[in-house]
């Protein structure tokens, strides 16, 4: 027969076990969350991005097409160049793309020179095509 003392003792022990089990689960949960956070951060910072082709894998025609598309998109925002050339869609004349003869696989950037001509003028540009990153920087005369 269960006495009042036995009943209280059983409830107290149950609650103590429950509380310590809860504390144990909190510790496990915190460790689990911490480990997941570390894994997520590592994935974000160290996961290799999808990169474009290396420059030695890009043909001259592909480089010119990429630079031309990028240039024509940017021309819409380059008011000074539009005024100088007299058009947003100039005629483009390509120069020779110089490639490295010694360290072909280490080449990170292709220099793509071209001339843009419009009804009001012409301008020489040098597109620096960063192949793997997939963007172009420009310089002009």
UniProtKB/Swiss-Prot annotation:
Keyword Acetylation: no
Gene assigned in the entry: cmi
Transmembrane segments: none
Key words of the record: Bacteriocin immunity, Disulfide bond, Plasmid
Disulfide bond keyword on record: yes
UniProt-recorded name of the protein: Colicin-M immunity protein
GO biological process, one term: bacteriocin immunity
Highest taxon above the source species: Bacteria
Role according to the record: This protein is able to protect a cell, which harbors the plasmid ColBM-Cl139 encoding colicin M, against colicin M.
InterPro entries per record: YebF/Cmi_sf (IPR038703), YebF/ColM_immunity (IPR025603)
Domain YebF/Cmi: 51-141
Gene3D superfamilies per UniProt: YebF/Colicin-M immunity protein (3.10.450.300)
PROSITE patterns: YEBF_CMI
Disulfide bonds: 55-131
């Amino acid at each position: 027969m269960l006495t009042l003392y036995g009943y209280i003792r059983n409830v107290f022990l149950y609650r103590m076990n429950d509380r310590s089990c809860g504390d144990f689960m909190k510790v496990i949960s915190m460790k689990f969350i911490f480990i997941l956070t570390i894994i997520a951060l590592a994935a974000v910072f160290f996961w290799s991005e999808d990169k474009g082709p290396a420059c030695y894998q890009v043909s001259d025609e592909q480089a010119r097409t990429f630079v031309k598309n990028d240039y024509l998109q940017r021309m819409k925002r380059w008011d000074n160049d539009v005024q100088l050339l007299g058009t947003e869609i100039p005629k483009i004349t390509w120069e020779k793309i110089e490639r490295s003869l010694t360290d072909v696989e280490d080449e990170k950037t292709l220099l793509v020179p071209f001339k843009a001509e419009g009804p009001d003028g012409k301008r020489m540009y040098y597109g620096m095509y960063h192949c793997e990153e997939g963007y172009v920087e420009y310089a002009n005369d």
